[in-house]
Amino acid sequence: MNILDVMKIPAFENANLIAGKAGGEREVQHVNMMDAPDIVDFLHKNELLVTTAYHLKDHPHQLSELIRQMAKRGCAGLGIKTKRYLEDIPKEIIELADSYAFPIIELPEHIRLGDIVNATLSHILDMRSNELQQAIYAHKKFTNHIMSGKGLQSLLKKVSDILQLPVLLLDQHAKMLSASHQISVETEKLKGTLNTVSGPFFTCFSTISDQKTYSVLPIYNHEKNCGYLLIPDMVQAGDKGLILTIEQAANVISFELLKENALKQFSRRARNEFFNNFIERTFSSDDEIKNRAKEFKLRWDQKYMCIAGKLDRNDESISFTENQLASDSVFEFLEGELSAFPFPPHFFMKGNVGIILIEATDSWSEMHASVISFLEQFQTQVSAQFKRTVSFGISNICQKLIDVPDAFTEASDALQSGHLSRSTAFIQVYHAKDVPELLRLLPVEDLKKFYNSTLQSLAEKQQEDQSLLHTLSVYLETHCQISETAKRLYVHRNTVIYRLEKCEELLGKSLKDPETTMRLRLALRMQRLIS
């Protein structure tokens, strides 16, 4: 109820709105009656004050300060009984109230302030009672509708009929879930604004790009935002009845989304359980794999590629639980985005690793650009929306479904390889590890022990030994060719022979022994990693 509604109450029949008419839409939630000098300290937002102005009769200039303070506090207005202690409202006071759009009501002398307060409060209570009755009726109506199995779209249509406006249901990432009408709204452009809407409160905003006004109510489950009820028009904040109806619809939708989410979780659990058993090779036969795979629309003779994704642990202060919740949110978002994937995808989770199993073509070169582009775009979205980074490992193409466990191993190895190099937000394509990569997987202490035991005194940092070590390294690189070694070192052939004999003496082994040369080659490769 606003000031203009108050003026229609019978108790205000002979009252006049003499100032601040531009503030006629100010909401009135309560009425107060007081004549104390410190009255302003007891007033609240949206409160209407009625007074005889007794405390102002000798200090009429204080009225201007009272108006300023009330306007600052967001009070609804001021009702003054004139012709008793205050004969008239001064012109400068009226001008001041007009400048603040702060309503001043001139009350007739013959009506008691108590009657005005009681009549106004009764009217407010009647309106609140009607609104609550309307909300209860709406909630019952919407609940019965959902319980009868008619679905969300039909419910949105009912809400739309009440509001006489289109109604859209968006998920927490601003993607359209359902709508009452076929309507084109670029929800992606609204994502940034919707993310700033906090708490389960009704909000209105306008966008500069399309010059449209939107009304939105976030939908919550377990104190977690699970979507938005969006109306592409202005719903007046003063229309409490309509807002209560929208809130009841949001409550019912929240329960329906909770039910749908429970069904999705059951489906995900069954899917993930199958995949885990499959890649761990716990099924007893190929026929069992074929039959179970059919449930998840996986074809036996189809070629597949596996992508393993994992949230990067950028901040070590994040707890395991926080990281797991963030990981769940990111991969739930990824699952929703897979409808735009360039090849038919199947999504699974194994622990905190998200797995995309792609129905592949014959050649990786045909798929490379579009797959990498999708993953890079997703990484950008995660960075913007979740303030985290995610990395991916990609396998080679496998020829049949039975080979998928090997493809998963390749994707996991590629992901681990990227993390070992301390990279973040990477996309690593699997390739067979060469010697340095295999050596990196070993503990540094083990590398040092092998290096020292193989090279013995040659491993020490002495000048003479260093020249011997360098000669030995070049000799092994040139496939034990003495002439080529001398040529590369710019020394005489006899010098090379002397140094190699010295090496054999220090090592106590022959350089013609294949086992010895293999160990020496490995030790020299390790030298670069250790240093």
UniProtKB/Swiss-Prot annotation:
Cystine bridges: none
Stated name of the protein: Purine catabolism regulatory protein
Gene Ontology BP annotations: positive regulation of DNA-templated transcription; purine nucleobase metabolic process
InterPro entries: CdaR-like_regulators, CdaR_GGDEF, PucR_C-HTH_dom, PucR_C-HTH_sf, PucR_dom
Pfam families assigned to the protein according to its UniProt record, in alphabetical order: GGDEF_2, HTH_30, PucR
Function statement: Activates the expression of pucFG, pucH, pucI, pucJKLM and guaD, while it represses pucABCDE and its own expression.
Keyword DNA-binding part of the UniProt annotation: yes
Keywords assigned: Activator, DNA-binding, Purine metabolism, Repressor, Transcription, Transcription regulation
